[in-house]
Amino acid sequence: MSRIGKLPIAIPAGVTFTVTPDNVVTVKGSKGQLVKAMAKDINIAVEDNSVVVTRNDDEKKSRSLHGLTRALINNMVVGVTEGYSKTLELIGVGYRAQLQGKKLVMNLGFSHPVEIEAVEGVTFETPAATKVVIKGIDKELVGNVAADIRSWRKPEPYKGKGIKYDNEVIRRKEGKTGKK
């Protein structure tokens, strides 16, 4: 049995959870609603304020989908109750971010400013000129948008310039020593 998959998911008060016969899960909460189609090989049942995920057989594919399905449903429940956020930090001379409506405009050392439109379900905040906070209820979407923004200028190992996650540690390298 999957260590993650066998754990039941508690449904908090104020959250409605529904499953259709073809395994489409809908979770509604105070922050919004998420809908996701799950694998057909997995059984999803609601038993007194908790969701139980089971599998039909012990094939390798079913075993791998068991824990995944449970984790995805748990992420949906947490998303509609608390939401998710990722913080990015801009490090470098002249690297700045600002909001223009729903658009994030960043100066990253290119000859032009980088403009990123907020996708539906994601909001941007700039608490400081060098910090960007991405918020939303879908963990996957928030992570993908943060990764897209980071990909414009990944942190480099010599000076540490670039866009990094706030909890990311950049491995630094020694520069050339030169002739002696």
UniProtKB/Swiss-Prot annotation:
Q: How does it associate, per the subunit comment? A: Part of the 50S ribosomal subunit.
Give the CC-aspect GO terms.
cytosolic large ribosomal subunit
Gene Ontology MF, one: structural constituent of ribosome
Query: Which PANTHER family does the record associate with it?
Result: 60S/50S RIBOSOMAL PROTEIN L6/L9, LARGE RIBOSOMAL SUBUNIT PROTEIN UL6M
Recorded family membership:
Belongs to the universal ribosomal protein uL6 family.
Q: What superkingdom does the record give?
A: Bacteria
Presence of keyword Transit peptide: no
**Function, in words:** This protein binds to the 23S rRNA, and is important in its secondary structure. It is located near the subunit interface in the base of the L7/L12 stalk, and near the tRNA binding site of the peptidyltransferase center.
Q: What is this protein called?
A: Large ribosomal subunit protein uL6
UniProt key word RNA-binding = yes
- Biological process terms in GO annotation: cytoplasmic translation
Short name of one Pfam family:
Ribosomal_L6
InterPro entries, A to Z: Ribosomal_uL6-like, Ribosomal_uL6-like_a/b-dom_sf, Ribosomal_uL6_a/b-dom, Ribosomal_uL6_bac-type, Ribosomal_uL6_CS
Q: Which SUPFAM superfamilies match?
A: Ribosomal protein L6 (SSF56053)
Keyword terms: Ribonucleoprotein, Ribosomal protein, RNA-binding, rRNA-binding
